Amino acid sequence: MRDDLMVQQQVETVWQHMVGVICLNCTGRKQVKKVLPILFTVAPTPVHFLNTPANTVKNIIESLGMVNIRYNRLKRMSNDFLTWDGEDATMLHGIGKYGSDSYRLFYKHEVPDNVGDHELKRYVEEEFYDLHPN
């Protein structure tokens, strides 16, 4: 993955976006950018993820820390994703304000109120300045 782009700018699907959000929690983007391509080769979709042995996924994400917690969040989110209506991202397990804001920006092309994350703020300023000036 390119270092000059956000993780969210380099994934192929909404599900992969949500995986990236969970992987970014309590870790650095450089670590995540090394892990995601490997994970998405093994499990490119939620169905593939749910059918991949837990130990395989855990070995891939181990370097991100909190491996059991992170794996359980990914598994529950992937299961939720299969029936999610695509509206409110916080309805997916493990997805909070950051995940919701980034989903709205990158997939719904909406600028959320009170974006808190500094990288998302920078993206809003660069890409949506005319829509939401500071």
Residue ranges and their predicted role:
Residues 114, 133-134:
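C-terminal interaction modules of eukaryotic adaptor/scaffold proteins
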Residues 1-86, 134:
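N-terminal polyanion-binding entry modules of DNA glycosylases/AP lyases
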